[in-house]
Amino acid sequence: MKEPLDGECGKAVVPQQELLDKIKEEPDNAQEYGCVQQPKTQESKLKIGGVSSVNERPIAQQLNPGFQLSFASSGPSVLLPSVPAVAIKVFCSGCKKMLYKGQTAYHKTGSTQLFCSTRCITRHSSPACLPPPPKKTCTNCSKDILNPKDVITTRFENSYPSKDFCSQSCLSSYELKKKPVVTIYTKSISTKCSMCQKNADTRFEVKYQNVVHGLCSDACFSKFHSTNNLTMNCCENCGSYCYSSSGPCQSQKVFSSTSVTAYKQNSAQIPPYALGKSLRPSAEMIETTNDSGKTELFCSINCLSAYRVKTVTSSGVQVSCHSCKTSAIPQYHLAMSNGTIYSFCSSSCVVAFQNVFSKPKGTNSSAVPLSQGQVVVSPPSSRSAVSIGGGNTSAVSPSSIRGSAAASLQPLAEQSQQVALTHTVVKLKCQHCNHLFATKPELLFYKGKMFLFCGKNCSDEYKKKNKVVAMCDYCKLQKIIKETVRFSGVDKPFCSEVCKFLSARDFGERWGNYCKMCSYCSQTSPNLVENRLEGKLEEFCCEDCMSKFTVLFYQMAKCDGCKRQGKLSESIKWRGNIKHFCNLFCVLEFCHQQIMNDCLPQNKVNISKAKTAVTELPSARTDTTPVITSVMSLAKIPATLSTGNTNSVLKGAVTKEAAKIIQDESTQEDAMKFPSSQSSQPSRLLKNKGISCKPVTQTKATSCKPHTQHKECQTDLPMPNEKNDAELDSPPSKKKRLGFFQTYDTEYLKVGFIICPGSKESSPRPQCVICGEILSSENMKPANLSHHLKTKHSELENKPVDFFEQKSLEMECQNSSLKKCLLVEKSLVKASYLIAFQTAASKKPFSIAEELIKPYLVEMCSEVLGSSAGDKMKTIPLSNVTIQHRIDELSADIEDQLIQKVRESKWFALQIDESSEISNITLLLCYIRFIDYDCRDVKEELLFCIEMPTQITGFEIFELINKYIDSKSLNWKHCVGLCTDGAASMTGRYSGLKAKIQEVAMNTAAFTHCFIHRERLVAEKLSPCLHKILLQSAQILSFIKSNALNSRMLTILCEEMGSEHVSLPLHAEVRWISRGRMLKRLFELRHEIEIFLSQKHSDLAKYFHDEEWVGKLAYLSDIFSLINELNLSLQGTLTTFFNLCNKIDVFKRKLKMWLKRTQENDYDMFPSFSEFSNSSGLNMTDITRIIFEHLEGLSQVFSDCFPPEQDLRSGNLWIIHPFMNHQNNNLTDFEEEKLTELSSDLGLQALFKSVSVTQFWINAKTSYPELHERAMKFLLPFSTVYLCDAAFSALTESKQKNLLGSGPALRLAVTSLIPRIEKLVKEKE
């Protein structure tokens, strides 16, 4: 065996020459590219999943009314079939390295195996007598690898044995599974942090190398991430981060187009939204494998389709149209249900394909070719269609549709082919690997130079190799920068995705809802400029970004590469500025030209640019993009009526910013299409029909529906039936008189007139510089202007031009000063509202704004921004009275929002409580619980806070509440629940609040005695001997805490003895939880307190000498600690009757279990008492009897306070378990049938596992309104008065109790709604 000579090299590689010829980085022509995009499944099994176009304008009006597209939301993890590979790779049979095209290959005589060198042939040659190698199993899919050449052996870190894989996709999938899984906790779970080794609540949980690491904070998470060099998985299209939810999730893999379609139909989960890059559960991520074997993740089906469409569009090569088979650059794309992409050259081909695709078997679709590029398609249900020109009815087969579309697009295809042949693909050179590439480059701007890379990996490697480091904005460490993000006008570098995500989250929490992302430059900023474009509200950081985005939106911008105007589909950030381009060709040409200019000396740059301008070829975009001049609306025109208008156009909504640009556009192409018979007619201003119509676009997560609007055509061709068509669509309108306006001349200033600043350029209006009067556009004539000067300002008739110029400058200065003053005033008022809102939310006195915030704000701005900024801060109105007025207005706005939401909710529940603990003022608080359909959940808000007289009855309380309910136009019949603390004035049988509300609510409201108050009443039931121990403990505590000297001396004594605690809590009867804490601390410090009381010669020291007394104290500390845990579990927001009843039942069963253990002398459930009894000679006979009697009485009192007959769960368990079979349901026969249907709904069953019970029933309203209403009437009522108690605690914390008690400031302190400050500021103007 020897190495072949140069002449024999061709013979050596003959067996696989065909394979080597196919190794290419990208397709060379349209035929190869079209072969790549051919789907593997039959069209009969596919569904169109999404429509997109280069022009990003909807073609819904062109599609069949009976044909609708639908997108499913992201759901479980899905493995979709990827786009077929573009090239076939050949590997060395020995070392498994890939053989590149043109590389010398070696093989044995009589064998087809290829090797990269003679060493590989020698090393891997084996005698025939050796036994066959053992079979290997793929580590990922566990399948046997039959062909040894397919084995890929890889050794991972921290793993000694190597692992085998059957393909590159299995290797990529295995590496993806080994990546760390991040779980974000929303509930506090106390564990030991893996980084700081502190016991704290777990914020993140990372499963890495089969070990679960708990992390307590963002700092520990970032440190763990950088220490282990981890990366977070994210969507390839939108960049949403992947994390695992805290609950159980189930992964599902789909391998066929049928499974994909079923998955999309059953998945109905709405993805969450967050600032910047959002978070997506890993169960919702879709896993695919590209042609190179790399595993890619997507957060939804929409992102997968959009990513593939973007890949096809950015390639810039010609593709065979799926309808007419013409090779052209694709202008429209259809995302099918199996993940494949169909490309089309025009909208006519899309309509033709849709008609053939959606036509049922055995039905002939009707289509009549009207003119070039136009086909009218009837709905599938219709049997025939009438031609627009008034001809006979004709039926056209799918083949004829394709034929007519191909014939109409033949001239366009020839032009596009000629232009495409002259286009040569420019390839760039990667700065790291020195490979040539023709894809969108990865850019790096460093030290005043631009660096181009073929991908993200090369960019990262270049940064590491050349130490491109900077200080990370989040972790404040000098590291290699991964990405730079712009926040509020400042570029912030980040060393990792985690730091960027945490910084964005902190930025969003700091600014709240005032923080928005600019639609143009993608920077996050609290500044907000809004503009509505074709019904969609866009937000921008400044006016400049809004104007640039508007020009891009209406396709009026020019390409930065070829300088042609039109749709710009590509953009890059070059030297800090955003550049826009037609397609990938222009991007590559621009980057190549800029790099060449940077390499040349300065005196040669202009020459190079001049040559480029001369030799630059026309862009393929302008020549190949058809101007759609006729689009038919298929929604409102009946099939049997003849419209007679063959050039009807759907008029798109164009804003004022683009109207001027549209009118000034050239219309030479349309003028050339006029018949010769009409050439004698005078030229008229034509409208750009390419802007008026709306081509196909991809709408995310919505179906592509036919446009239902049909309006009169904008055309200059006389139509025979134009009058009839106008009468059919809209009533006749009056003819408008054509106005001939004269343009402004500078000579008009001699008579004292200038152009009014607010007038339109198409019809300017003159304004007098003396009196400021504005005349109409028709008066823009010298005679009329001179007449105004002679009649009204005759004394100034002979003044020179300089006089009127001076008056003009004075008027301009006045207008600019007034505008600037109004702008500043608006910003100052907004700042005043923001400070007032934060003052009330922080429960601070109103005077703090003027006394503390304003002086420091002036000093800071003067020091940082200059004295002018400090002077501006002084003008912010922040007086005590102003802040109070601002708070009243903010509270009124929140109250208006609340009442509106309650009216939309229909059903609501109330929580009422009164208190007189604060400044001897009796306050009545009322909270309301309602359904917020905006966020699809239940909300709780403060309804009102009213000051009451000291002595008031239940009837008077009802009058106050009823007066407020009537003033807000709320209906008592919609009240489904009322919760109180059980006071006599609230629950009176005849004259109490309960009786009055039952009277007006027609017995529809369910009344609930607060669970926490009932639990407190149960805890107060003690035997006389135990109650005596409690009183004596309080006496000891009062002796120590009543004297400051005694407290200090006890603290010193505890510190000297090394005690864990050095002080005692203060006991109060009104504080329920303080009783358990006081007894526990008293027992823990019993030795220190005994020594202290003995030194003080107090008689109270004798109690600690009695072991039986100490044993009873230990038992009381244990039992009250357990009761405190139950009390805390009953507190919180959004609690339901079902949750609290379950917790009460659990405690009842624990009491029975403790009684059984007490009889067996087992006291492990009482740790303090068990420890003391084991370490002392305590006589257990008497104390066991006391404990048993107390537990038995406690169990009885719980049963009396929570009787089974008042348990609303009986017959209503279907609400919290709708997918389980229940014997007794309080439902009608119709509701039982609906519940059976709901239990079989797989979509709702998947939703039930991921949302709360209330959210589930709110989402089920559309499909099951009866069950929704029945369930919400049991879920809305309050079970506790916790919110009222929390509001009273907020009043206690405030320094301005008398002001907070008035209501507005208290509402801002406890509300979760955001006031509409922009609306309030506009009302001030």
Curated annotation (Swiss-Prot):
Q: What is this protein called?
A: Zinc finger MYM-type protein 6
Zn-finger segments (MYM-type): 113-151, 163-206, 213-248, 296-334, 342-443, 451-485, 492-531, 538-572
Q: Taxonomically, what lineage is the organism?
A: Eukaryota, Metazoa, Chordata, Craniata, Vertebrata
- GN (gene name): ZMYM6
> Which SMART domains is this protein grouped with?
TRASH
One Pfam family this sequence matches: zf-FCS
Ranges annotated as biased composition (Polar residues):
695-706
The protein's location, in the record's own words, is:
Nucleus
Q: Which organism is it from?
A: Homo sapiens
Q: Which GO terms describe its biological process?
A: cytoskeleton organization; regulation of cell morphogenesis
